[in-house]
From Swiss-Prot:
It catalyses: [(1->4)-alpha-D-galacturonosyl methyl ester](n) + n H2O = [(1->4)-alpha-D-galacturonosyl](n) + n methanol + n H(+). The gene is PME23. The keyword Disulfide bond applies. In the N-terminal section; belongs to the PMEI family. PROSITE patterns: PECTINESTERASE_1, PECTINESTERASE_2. Its EC number is 3.1.1.11. One of its GO terms (biological process) is cell wall modification. Disulfide bonds join 400-420. It comes from Arabidopsis thaliana (Mouse-ear cress). Residues 1-33 form the signal peptide. It is found in: Secreted, Cell wall. The PMEI region may act as an autoinhibitory domain and prevent untimely PME activity during transport. Its main location: secreted. NCBIfam families: PME_inhib. This is Probable pectinesterase/pectinesterase inhibitor 23.
């Protein structure tokens, strides 16, 4: 039971947020109880003003106002109007898909590469719609305004990432179809941007609305809902609870829902067969023990497989390997991953993942993660170009090793790598190495890549050639690329300039790159590039990119029994 002071604070919080929502429709008149033509006029006037208010922060105001008014809103409540925005965006994507299925598909079918790009694009647009549906279905509560807004921003950022990836898939082929696709999906992409702008507007007012006590209260509330005193979720069964607790300290005897073993000592010989045993509509951890061995298979944890956990016998004992690539095999980058994770609430511990295509294979992903609330602990992820594709949503990596050459940690997730070893490998002759290539394409996306307490070093085979094949902390894949490196040891494998342009002056003014409290010979910033987008963080700024603030990690990471540092 809270004190009177707590009740007063909660009242202030609710009043602050409610006040903001009222301000958005400040011109709305009181509705009369009797229906008349005048009532209709008043309703239209009120609704128009409310729509103009919620559309005010958007970049495409005409598109926003026309789409909402065209949907004949029956409410002037701003939350209802924002959710109506999600609905019209879904409708627009579906209509654009239908149009593309006629206009573009006929052209794409004549070219195998274009056909593959279109088929991938169809899937990605459906994924984009799914994220928008999550937003529509999310219950709103003033008492949980921060959680509400955070979830919406993550899912809207995910929807935008899926749509951008669709366009990128056409960029990998020699064709003018990308321009055709951009034209067809222009309105739906504008609507997606507008939805994010409306939601972000709420979030920008939260810190100024006397909500300082809310974050802690919400974290405490979420923990109460999800977990017992031992920080394991209440919905975890007793056997799964014992297993998760046991695995927190490393590999050991495992009793799981499914066991994979190549020698026949488990129920399954392949990981894919074990995944097929995940119950439909699964809502509790389904733990798959993958015994020691080399598994040559392409593994996909689909969106219909939430709450899956992989536990191996060690990153050097349980190895999942593949070699799909774009450079030689002409497989779309998005589809080259040895392991693909799309099911939410995924956890992996003590496994190795690799793509063996080599530097000549070009883009060759070892691990691609598009799931929300994904956690990897004590895993080794090896490749060359595009090793780790942190595609979208919330992701956390702890005590992992990631190796590669070009853009080998890339994507548009809201992601932290903590206490990880980042290894630059020997590239092809003439190649330059970039550790990161973050892909935020909209300035309001909540996404970004944080390396916290990591160690950036070089493979022994790379060290002799570091002065010729230089390595950099990263480059901006998209216009609003955001990467923060803090409390990380940086060896002298990184060039003193630190960062590399993508092409010309692209994104140099709009990116957000920061280094904070790093150590090691490669951390000296005296000769760093002086781009407008390079930031110097204050200690207060750095708090925004910690586990508890950037990922709201206190509410979900401890439940996985993975080590986790919440603060700087």
């Amino acid at each position: 039971m809270g004190s009177d002071g707590d009740k007063k604070k909660k009242f202030i919080v609710a009043g602050s947020v409610s006040g903001f929502l009222v301000i958005m429709v400040v011109s709305v008149a009181v509705v009369t109880s009797k229906h008349s033509p005048k009532d209709d006029e008043n309703h239209i006037r009120k609704t128009t003003k409310a729509v103009q208010a919620v559309c005010a922060p958007t970049d495409f105001k005409d598109t926003c106002v026309n789409s909402l008014m065209g949907a004949s809103p029956d409410s002037d409540d701003p939350v209802d109007l924002i959710k109506l925005g999600f609905k019209v965006t879904i409708k627009s994507i579906n209509e654009s898909l239908e149009k593309a299925s006629g206009d573009i598909k006929a052209k794409a079918d004549k070219n195998p590469e274009a056909k593959g790009a279109f088929e991938l694009c169809e899937k990605l647009m459906i994924d984009a719609i799914d994220d928008l549906k999550k937003c529509m279905d999310h219950g709103f509560s003033v008492d949980q305004i921060e959680v509400f807004v955070e979830d919406l921003r993550v899912w809207l950022s995910g929807s935008i990432a899926f749509q951008q990836t669709c366009m990128d898939s056409f960029g990998e082929i020699k064709s003018n179809l990308m321009q055709d696709m951009l034209k067809i999906f222009k309105t739906s992409r504008e609507l997606s941007s507008n939805s994010l702008a409306m939601v972000t507007r709420i979030s920008t007012l939260i810190p100024n609305s006397n909500l300082t006590g809310l974050t802690g209260a919400l974290a405490k509330y979420a923990r109460k809902l999800l977990s017992t005193e031992d920080s394991i979720p209440t919905w975890v069964g007793p056997e799964a609870r014992r297993l998760m607790a046991a695995q927190g300290g490393g590999p050991g005897p495992v009793k799981a829902n499914a066991v994979v073993a190549q020698d026949g000592t488990g129920q399954f010989k392949t990981i894919t067969d074990a995944l097929n045993a995940v119950p439909k509509g699964n809502k509790v951890p389904f733990i798959i023990h993958i015994k020691e061995g080399i598994y040559k298979e392409k593994v996909t944890v689909t969106k219909k497989m939430p709450h899956v956990t992989f536990i191996g016998d060690g990153p050097n004992k349980t190895l999942i390997t593949g070699s799909l690539n774009f450079g030689i095999g002409k497989v779309k980058t998005f589809l080259t991953a040895t392991i693909t994770i799309e099911g939410d609430h995924f956890t992996a511990k003590n496994i190795g993942i690799e793509n063996t295509a080599g530097p000549e294979g070009g883009q060759a992903v070892a691990l691609r993660v598009s799931a929300d609330y994904a956690v990897f602990h004590s895993c080794q992820i090896d490749g060359h170009q595009d090793t780790l594709y942190v595609h979208s949503h919330r992701q956390f990596y702890r005590d992992c090793t990631v190796s590669g050459t070009v853009d080998f940690i890339f994507g548009d997730a809201k992601c932290i790598l903590q206490n990880c070893k980042i290894v630059v490998r020997k590239p092809n002759k003439g190649q330059t190495c970039m550790v990161t290539a973050q892909g935020r394409s909209n300035v309001r996306e909540s996404t970004g890549l944080v390396l916290h307490g990591c160690h950036i070093t070089g493979d022994p085979a790379y060290i002799p050639m570091k002065s010729v094949n230089k390595a950099y902390l990263g480059r901006p894949w998209k216009e609003f690329s955001r990467t923060i490196i803090m409390k990380t040891t940086i060896d002298d494998v990184i060039d003193p300039a630190g960062w590399l342009p993508w092409s010309g002056d692209f994104a140099l003014k709009t990116l957000y790159y920061a280094e904070h409290m790093n150590t090691g010979p490669g951390s000296n910033q005296a000769q760093r590039v002086k781009w407008p987008g390079i930031k110097k963080l204050t200690p207060q700024d750095a708090l925004l990119y910690t586990g508890d603030r950037f990922l709201r990690g206190d509410t979900w990471i401890p439940q996985t029994q993975v080590p986790y540092t919440a603060k700087v």
